[in-house]
């Protein structure tokens, strides 16, 4: 195992989120998956993390720093905010996070890019553009002339065996980077949301 990767994931697990702490269990499970080289599981869990991050951030933002001191029953403290945000899909939540100022225009575009690149293909089974356009080298030989092997570059999109091999290779290369991008947003949102609780 890559020692740098191991140290990085250990540091993330030990990181302290204040406002976004309720989703730490998902972060821990993603770290476990990445440490065990379970790239599909890590990516799928990161998709969940991205969705839950935006929903939680919007619920907290909409509450504008509501605390137990506000004379509200604990179990109903965020009822309105939850009802308003919980059923929204990722696209809508990215747009809303931008509209309320939790993310800027550049972050919004990046989140939409990673939504298209990772969430849709790996949570919904649609084609990933990076993989769909991939090519691979295959060997072509004739059984009667095994010495004459030719190599040909072919697209993977029309051959399920090649497509899924390419998809797996893509996740091996990109799942850690995807998680780190999402984690960066969590830390950034956590810091922004802390300002709601500073008097």
Residue ranges and their predicted role:
Residues 27-31, 35-59:
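Short, hydrophobic, well-ordered secondary-structure elements
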Residues 13-20, 36-43, 47, 80-87, ...:
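Amphipathic, non-membrane alpha-helical segments in soluble helical-bundle scaffolds
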Residues 22-26, 52, 118:
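Amphipathic, well-ordered alpha-helical segments in soluble domains
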Residues 54-61, 65, 123-126, 130:
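Short amphipathic alpha-helical interaction/hinge segments
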Residues 47-51, 66-68, 137-143:
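Amphipathic alpha-helical scaffolding segments
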Residues 101-199:
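Charge-enriched, short contiguous segments at helix-coil
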Residues 59-112, 142, 158-159:
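Flexible secondary-structure boundary motifs
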Residues 1-40, 65:
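Charged alpha-helical initiation segments
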